[in-house]
Structures are given as structure tokens and as C-alpha cells.
Amino acid sequence: THDPSFSIWCGADHLYDKDPVHWSQIRQQLRGYVNVDGVVYSFLGDKEFHETIGQTGVDVTATSTTYTFENEKIILNVKFTSPLLLDDLTLVSRPCTYIDYAVEKKENCDFVVASDLVSQKQAKLIGCNARRPEKGDAPAYNYAQMGRAAQKPLGGSGDHVTIDWGYVYVASAEKGAVCTYDAANEKL
């Protein structure tokens, strides 16, 4: 939660019970899946027709929330971090939340973690898929982005106004990670 425009959270006991919502109860479609040895498990958002991977814990701190999921083959940690450090006003004013995924194998298995960030705004979207080369000490990484073609930051007002400007980025420096903007389905 940053401000009334950029404010989503899980309104259920388990992260996979339903989609996250804005404070006004407007659904924000954000989905997370982990494929373990060919079986798809839901861990974030409405599980739809998928099995779920058991949520075994949640840890809330001042700047982050970490959910732990586990089955017989893996332990998955999903960490949402909003760097709201009060001694850095520039950082506090940045409407940005980071989502980190960490998987620990309990036994030998293949896995893929995937997220779908789906726009529900009635607007023309633009996006791209790209690779940033290695630069100095920073490693190379793949990324994708999505945002409205026409943006009016803070151009709306009212009780049920969600953020409708800026860009969503998905990035990973992990070898083999795929970050994709899907224009046809308006999702990352």
C-alpha cells in the first residue's frame, strides 16, 4: 500500500483464495503459478481450475510480506517489498512494489514459476520484450514492460480510482528466465 491510487492487497486467508483487490474492492488480476514436474499449482490470485500449493506461512514486516508455500517437492517463498524507508523521501514517493520468488528443492524435480499480470483497464496498452546487456558490475537481464499508451499521471479523482499510469516491469537475471509481454491478451 502506497497511496489510495496504488493500493492492492489480499483480502483472504490464503494468497490463492481470490484475486488481490484495491481498497475500494476493485479486483486487481494478479496470478501466480508454479509448475512442478508437469503439475501446475496456483499460489497467487484466483486459483481457477488449478490445484493449490499449500500456504504454510506468512511473515509481515514494516516494508515487506513474505508468503511460504510447500509441498513434498519444493518450498516456494514469495516476497512483496515496498521500500518505504522514511529516511529516503525519493524512495518513499516511488509507487513501486517488488515481487521476489525463491524456490528450494526438497527433492530432485523440475519447476517453473510464472506470474500473469493482467490489465483490466479499458485503454490501449503498449509493451515490449527486451534484454539489457551486462553493464559494469550489473549482470545482464531479460525484461518485459506494459503500460497505457496515453498516460495522465494523477489525472483522475474519486473514491474508486486506481492507478492508471506508469509501467509494470517484469525482469530476471536468472539464466533461462523468460519475461514476456503478450499484446494479444494484454498481460505480462
Task: Cite the ranges covered by each PLM segment.
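Accessory carbohydrate-recognition regions in carbohydrate-active enzymes
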Residues: T1-L188
